[in-house]
Amino acid sequence: MTYQEYLEKVKLAKEWMRAYYEDDEPLASDEEYDKLIRELKEFEALYKDKISKDSPTQNIAPTIQSEFHKITHSAKMWSMEDVFDEAELRAWAKRAKCEFDFFIEPKFDGASLNLTYENGKLISGATRGDGEIGEDITLNVKEISNIPKIIPYKDKIEIRGEVVILKEDFEKINEKRAKDGLSLFANPRNGASGSLRQLDTSITKERNLKFYPWGVGENSLKFSKHSEVMEFIRSLGFLKDDFVYCVKTLDEVLEKYHELLEKRDQKPMMMDGMVVRVDDLKKCQELGYTVKFPKFMAAFKFPALEKTTTLLGVNLQVGRSGVITPVAILEPVELDGVVVKSATLHNFDEITRLGVMIGDSVSVIRSGDVIPKITKVFTQRRDGLESKITKPSLCPECLSELLDEGAFLKCQNLDCKARLVNSIIYFVSKKCLNIDGLGENIVELLFKEGKITNIESIFFLKYDDFLNLEGFKEKKINNLLNAIENAKKCSLSRFITALGIEHIGEVAAKKLAQSFGFDWFLQSYEAYVNLEGFGEQMAKSLQEFTKINHQRIKHFYEILHLEDEKKELALNENISNKTFVITGTLSKSRDHFKELIESFGAKVSSSVSKKTDFVLYGSEAGSKLEKAQSLGVKCINEDEFNALLGGDDEV
C-alpha cells in the first residue's frame, strides 16, 4: 500500500465511522469495516512515522453532533481490540504478558451505555459517544424496564453495559416499521442504538430493550478481581447472562469460544464475539492502555453473519397459492460457513421500500436456518450501470395474466405447473406428511417425467415408475415406497395442514381436527368463525376451499389412514382450556410439548399477555419469561409441568 492509498483509506474509514456513529446509517458491513481497519493497522505498524492523526485507529469515535445534550463520562469509555483467530488471541495474550486467569463473557451486539448512580439513585444515562463525551439519554434509559432506578449502594458509581434488542422483538419492530412505511433497521444493534436516541420516550419503552452490564467506570469498590466486581454489580439488580466464566488458560478460553459459537443461534440476542480480559485488577492497572484500547482485554470476534455482495438479478418463484415471490440472485458470498447465492425479496413492495436495483451493492444477513435476506442497499456506491427491477404482468411459468393485489402478484391458473409442483412439495414436507426421501428435486423429477400429476398420484407410485430414472436403485426405490406407505398413517391435523389452505396453519388445523374430527370440511361459515382464534378471513378461506375440494377430501380419506384427534382429546382439569406459552430450551422439541399440551384440551400461544395462564420455560428463556413474571403469570419448569399433567394441584 502506498502512502497516498493509505490516506484514501483513512478518509473512507472516517466516512464509514461517521455514518455508523452519528447517523445510525452504516455505509458498509461490519466485515468490510473490520477489514479496512486491519489494513490501516498493518500499514501503521510498518510506518509509524506516517500515521495520520485522522486515522480511526487513533480515535474512538467522531465528535458527537445531535439534538441531545452532552455528558462527560467521569472515566473514559474505551473500545476493545479485536482478535479474529487463535493466532491473534495468543499474540494479544503475549502482549498482555498474561496466559492465565481470564474472565470471559458474550460480546452482545448492541449499543454501549454508561449509567451513573449517586446515593443509590440513577442520575444519568449516556451513550459511549467518543469515549469521553456521550449523549444524555437519561429519560429514555429510565424506560428500560430491567435497569434499576434505585440500587442498594450509596457511593458514586458508573455502571457500563450493552443495550440489546432480542431477536424476536427485533422482527416485530421491523414488521411494524414496514407497515408504517418506515425504513427497516439493518440489524438489532442499529435498532438498539436508534431506540435509545428517540426524542419520544414512549417509542423507547415499547421497544422492550434489555441492558446487560459488562463493567464499571468511576467507582470506589475494593475488589481485587473483575469477576468479583461483576458479581457485585449483578447483586444490585442487574441481569446476568448464563455464559460467564473464569478460566485458567488460553486453551480453556478457546474451548469456551467454540462452545459459545455453537450456541450463537440459540441465544435470544445477537452476539458478535466473546470478551476476554485479565481478571486480576492490579495486573490490569499495570498493563494500562494504548491510545485507543485497554491492553488487558480483547474482543474475540465471531465469523460475520452479515456481508456485502452484489445483486446480479431477480428470479420470480411461483408458490403453491400462486403468489409470485421475487428472489435476489447474488454474487456468491460465504456466511457462517454457508455459501449464499440468493436471498428473499418478499414482494414488490419490499423492492420499492429498499429501493434496490440490479447491480447494487447490498448487505445480506443470515442467522441459523433463517432464509438470507437483504437488509440494506449501499446507494452511495452506484456507478450508473444499475437497472430497475420491473414488475411482471405474466406468470413466469405458464404465461397467464397475473392478478395485481398491490404488494402481491398472483397466478390464478390452477393448472400452472409451478403451483402443482409446490403444492406437492409442501404436502410431503416435514411439518406435513413428512415423507422421508421425497424431497424437492425428486418431486420435480417425477412431475417432469409424468409419474405424478397431483398430490394423490404420489400414493399410487409403483416400483416400475422409478426403474429408468437416474439415481434410483433397488434399495432407494424400496425405501421411498415404504416411506410413502408409512405416511398414509398420520394425524388428521397434519393432513389438514398439508392441504395448504390459505390462512390455515398448524394451530388452526389442530383446532379444526379437535373440534370437528373427520367432519371438519362439512361445517358452515358460522361454525368456523365461532372457533376460538378464527376470524372472518380464515372462515371464508375454509368455506371456499371445502366447497371446491369436497369430493377430493373424501378421496383422500379413502387413500389415507387418518387418526381422529377429536376422540383422543383427554381433558385435564389442571390445564384444560388454559393458555400456555413455551420459551427457552427444553428436553424435547417445542413441537412435542405443544402437541402434548393441546392433547389435554389447552392451547399454546406465541406471545405472553395477561390472559396467559402458564409459561413453560427451559434454559436460556428470554423476554417472554421476564414479561410473564412482571405480569404475575405462573411460570413452570418441566418438572412442574409433569406434575400438572399428573393432576398435582399443589403446583
From Swiss-Prot:
GO terms for cellular component: cytosol. The keyword DNA-binding does not apply. Keywords: DNA damage, DNA repair, DNA replication, Ligase, Magnesium, Manganese, Metal-binding, NAD, Zinc. Residues 570-651 form the BRCT domain. One of its GO terms (molecular function) is DNA ligase (NAD+) activity. Transmembrane segments: none annotated. The keyword Cytoplasm does not apply. It catalyses: NAD(+) + (deoxyribonucleotide)n-3'-hydroxyl + 5'-phospho-(deoxyribonucleotide)m = (deoxyribonucleotide)n+m + AMP + beta-nicotinamide D-nucleotide. One of its GO terms (biological process) is DNA replication. It is an enzyme of class 6 (ligase). The active site is at K107. Its cofactor is Mg(2+); Mn(2+). Zn(2+) binds at C395, C398, C411, C416. Its EC number is 6.5.1.2. InterPro entries: BRCT_dom, BRCT_dom_sf, DisA/LigA_HHH, DNA_ligase, DNA_ligase_AS, DNA_ligase_CS, DNAligase_adenylation, DNAligase_N. It comes from the Bacteria. NAD(+) binds at D30, E31, E32, Y33, D34, S79, M80, E105, R128, E162, K301. Pfam families: BRCT, DNA_ligase_aden, DNA_ligase_OB, HHH_2. Belongs to the NAD-dependent DNA ligase family. LigA subfamily. HAMAP family: DNA_ligase_A. NCBIfam families: dnlj, PRK07956.1. DNA ligase that catalyzes the formation of phosphodiester linkages between 5'-phosphoryl and 3'-hydroxyl groups in double-stranded DNA using NAD as a coenzyme and as the energy source for the reaction. It is essential for DNA replication and repair of damaged DNA. This is DNA ligase.
